[in-house]
Amino acid sequence: MLSRKRPLLVAAVLVAAAVPAFAWGHTGHAMINRMACDLLPEGPLRTFFKANQDYVAHHAIDPDNFKRSHRADEGPRHYLNIDAGGTKPLDYPRTWKGTVEKFGLHAATKQGKLPWTIKETFDSLVAAFKEKDAVKIVATATWLGHYVGDAHQPFHACTNHDGADTGQKGIHSLFESAMLDHNEDEIHKAALAMAKDMTVAEVRTDVTAYAFEVLTESDKEAHEVLAKDKGNRTSGREKALYQATGAIAEKRIAEAAVSLASLWLTAWIQAGKPELPATVEMPTGIAPEPVRGDAELSGGAPKKPDEKKPEEKKPESDRDD
């Protein structure tokens, strides 16, 4: 878990089920991506991201929009039911192959793919840095920010992702969107203060293992939020929830921003610290999707430019978060 003035270990939250919500919503995802740019250590990498900060923040929500309009198999890449089937988080298989062997392909897919998606996207960012492709770097870094943010959202790491199992239905979007929208300034101020007391540093562990650390912590935080939620459905519930759990949201957002900045820094270092351009002309519309490296995990190899668009697949999960 994240410790102050020490290299960050991401703590994440992955959830499984059907939830009509965007993880952290636009407010939270933009906050995390923007803050990560500010937290990078002084140097060429920070200069590059500060020059593209508005794009990285504004397009932080793009992966959610993308999964609704472009790829039906994108949904499970945004969460992980780390407690699926009563599994203890520390006992959940750490490889996709092991997960499929334990649960079967259908169940494994419905339970989510987030930690491997983070690793896959991180590898794509390293490749983009090596290619010195500025557009790919900015776009892939933006997508990575979304996935890292998802991992730190407590209700993206547990099966009771919307409180249905405990009579608290609606808690997911209330925690990640409504509460943030109603208390944006306070949460941003507190999260930034926390983040500045943490250390952005090269991640020296395996990125998948790093993501699992985040998810394990997120699962714990989900149970804490559920315990503190009074379950009332009054119009003032956002205020009550903020008073009870606002500190958890602030901490997770701070940790997500530090984790993201650390992963950006690590990708740049692993690529050999290439020189970066002063300006980048990004395309309009949704940020370009990163290259998917693992065909089995991704639901198929990337489509070649001259291939016809395949017939749209049915969603692999009933979750919409």
Where are these regions (language model features)?
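Bacterial N-terminal signal peptides that target proteins for export
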Residues: 1-9
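Bacterial N-terminal signal peptides
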Residues: 10-18
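Short linear motifs at secondary-structure transitions and domain/linker junctions
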Residues: 11, 149, 236-239
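Preference for short coil/turn "hinge" residues that link or interrupt alpha-helices
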Residues: 14-15, 148, 168
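N-terminal, motif-rich segments that launch catalysis or mediate targeting to/interaction with membranes
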Residues: 20-143, 154-254, 258-321
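Functional cores that coordinate and move charged inorganic groups
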Residues: 143-149
